[in-house]
């Protein structure tokens, strides 16, 4: 029997703007599982910031985190495979951040750390406070990102935001050119920086093929630039209606936005 897979981005796709799951999506995905589909979350988030959604969907598959940087097993509470950022690259990036006066949120081991409480940090921290303590991601303010980068086991990625968007775009290109790191936009005002070569599509393909399955039988849902790699790698790439036109152009199908029952409708109409 052919095993079919549904790969799901979270923010801007499966989640509403209020960071909640639509009841219709939960129900449709449960029906898809009953019909034999494997569900997997493929996100730019740290694994500590996925708990409520993973549990609500009652998943048993690993999660692809930080734009494909690592594969995390929630039940064993362990990283299965990873390509973290080399420490020397992290230190060079931190030096560049300081030179350009850009604040970064650094994703490490089991936490997200920062020096200054920027808009992105405050926004995500406020969301975290709405969760039960056992589901709350760990945010830690540190005196030095550089010192922390040398003390942890792994640096997964950096998330950067800045009031001056053109400056942030220029900085991202500068980092790619100078350090050979991967820069992907995960939100309209946020660029994620990770080890060169990491992507959602690459990690998803590796996981699917390791199970002996085919990417032709994968349906991937996404909305942003960091989703393009998996939308193109999947047999069917589905872009949300709220996606940028450049993302929609790389998908096979475009559905409604993330405030509607479009994911559920697609599942019922095309998959089960």
Curated annotation (Swiss-Prot):
EC id: 3.1.3.74
Any GO BP: pyridoxal phosphate catabolic process
Cross-referenced Pfam families: Hydrolase_3 (PF08282)
Keywords: Hydrolase, Magnesium, Metal-binding
Gene3D superfamilies: 3.30.1240.10, HAD superfamily/HAD-like
Residues where Mg(2+) binds: 9, 11, 223
Keyword presence, DNA-binding: no
Binding site for phosphate: 10, 43-44, 200, 226
Matches recorded under InterPro entries: Cof, HAD-like_sf, HAD-SF_hydro_IIB, HAD_sf
Official protein name in the record: Pyridoxal phosphate phosphatase YbhA
């Amino acid at each position: 029997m052919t095993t079919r897979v549904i790969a799901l981005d979270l923010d801007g796709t499966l989640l509403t703007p209020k960071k909640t799951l639509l009841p219709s999506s939960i129900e449709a995905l449960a029906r898809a599982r009953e019909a034999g589909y494997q569900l997997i979350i493929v996100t730019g988030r740290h694994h500590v910031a996925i708990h409520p959604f993973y549990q609500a969907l009652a998943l048993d598959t690993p999660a692809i985190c930080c734009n494909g940087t690592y594969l995390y097993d929630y039940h064993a509470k362990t990283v299965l495979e990873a390509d973290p950022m080399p420490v020397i690259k992290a230190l060079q990036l931190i030096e560049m951040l300081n030179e350009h006066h850009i604040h970064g949120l650094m994703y490490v081991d089991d936490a997200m750390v920062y020096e200054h409480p920027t808009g992105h940090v405050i926004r995500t921290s406020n969301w975290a406070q709405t969760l039960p303590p056992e589901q709350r991601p760990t945010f830690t303010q540190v005196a030095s990102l550089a010192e922390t980068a040398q003390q942890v086991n792994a640096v997964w990625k950096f998330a950067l935001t800045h009031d001056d968007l053109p400056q942030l775009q220029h900085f991202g290109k500068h980092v790619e050119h100078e350090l050979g790191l991967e820069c992907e936009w995960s939100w309209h005002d946020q660029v994620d920086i990770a080890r060169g070569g990491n992507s959602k599509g690459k990690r998803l393909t590796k996981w699917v093929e390791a199970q002996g399955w085919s990417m032709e039988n994968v349906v991937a849902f996404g909305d942003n630039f960091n989703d393009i790699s998996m939308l193109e790698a999947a047999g069917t790439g589905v872009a949300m209606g709220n996606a940028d036109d450049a993302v929609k152009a790389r998908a096979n199908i475009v559905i409604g936005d993330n405030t509607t029952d479009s994911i559920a409708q697609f599942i019922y109409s095309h998959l089960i």
